[in-house]
Design a protein with these regions (language model features):
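Hydrophobic positions on the long internal alpha-helix
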Residues: 1-5, 58-59, 113, 117
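Conserved Rossmann-fold NAD(P)-dependent oxidoreductase catalytic core, especially the SDR/UDP-sugar
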Residues: 1-45
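Active-site Tyr-X1-5-Lys
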Residues: 3, 43-71
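Conserved SDR Rossmann-fold cofactor-binding beta-strand/turn motif
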Residues: 17-18, 73-78
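Short-chain dehydrogenase/reductase
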Residues: 33-40, 44-56, 100-108
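Alpha-helical substrate-binding/gating segment
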Residues: 79-95, 100-128
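Mid/C-terminal beta-alpha module of Rossmann-like enzyme folds, strongest
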Residues: 113-172
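Amphipathic terminal alpha-helices
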Residues: 165-166, 173-178, 182-192
Length: 192
């Protein structure tokens, strides 16, 4: 599809990737660093994450062939319809997809992320951006949940700093800087 559109002159693309491109759906997953960067490598073991990673790689391949195209790959968080947002997560056992359960955005914000990406000025290149809320979907500090899941396997010091206790597990600074997107429906607003 990309090649077809490129051959017909389309210059701008916004593609739906997933925060699962890093491979978090496997219980053996441990991030390289926290918060998880936009360009975190794929450490997938189950097949789902690598399918998203391959899509991102195909977009890079297409760009190498046509360096005048603008591609934004949004690594989208778990998305819930606005009137069916789950309760905030507490400490619980690590299961498949656990990280997705604390990285939630409502549908209105997800649509806004895509809209703002489409409306963002044309900029040739390939960009990968975490499209998640700025806060984790938790009722307790993130470090407590991650320590319960991963023990001392991962450096949690970022979440132990004052003011970062409830921050998203994913770094959202690039999407904020480049397209101005910040999810509006955060746990504090939704749960009050």
């Amino acid at each position: 599809m990309l090649r077809y559109l490129i051959n017909r002159g389309c210059k701008k693309y916004v593609l739906a990737s997933s925060i699962a491109a890093v491979g978090f759906q496997d219980r053996k997953f441990r991030p390289v660093n926290l918060p998880i960067a936009d360009d975190h490598p794929c450490l997938d073991r189950s097949g789902y994450g690598i399918s998203k990673y391959f899509m991102e790689e195909i977009s890079k391949y297409c760009y190498r062939q046509s360096e005048d195209i603008d591609i934004i790959n949004l690594r989208l968080s778990s998305v819930c319809v606005d009137n069916n947002i789950p309760p905030l997560k507490d400490i619980s056992p690590l299961t498949e997809w656990s990280l997705g359960g604390i990285t939630i955005m409502n549908l209105t914000d997800a649509i806004r992320a895509f809209t703002m990406s489409v409306e963002n000025p044309y900029k040739p290149g390939v960009r990968i951006m975490n499209a998640t809320g700025p806060k984790a979907w938790t009722s307790v500090p993130v470090a407590e949940i991650l320590r319960n899941w991963w023990g001392d396997d991962v450096d949690l010091s970022y979440f132990e700093q004052s003011g970062n206790e409830y921050d998203s597990v994913y770094d959202v600074s690039r999407i904020q800087q480049e397209i101005g997107f910040i999810a509006l429906n955060t746990p504090e607003i939704t749960s009050s």
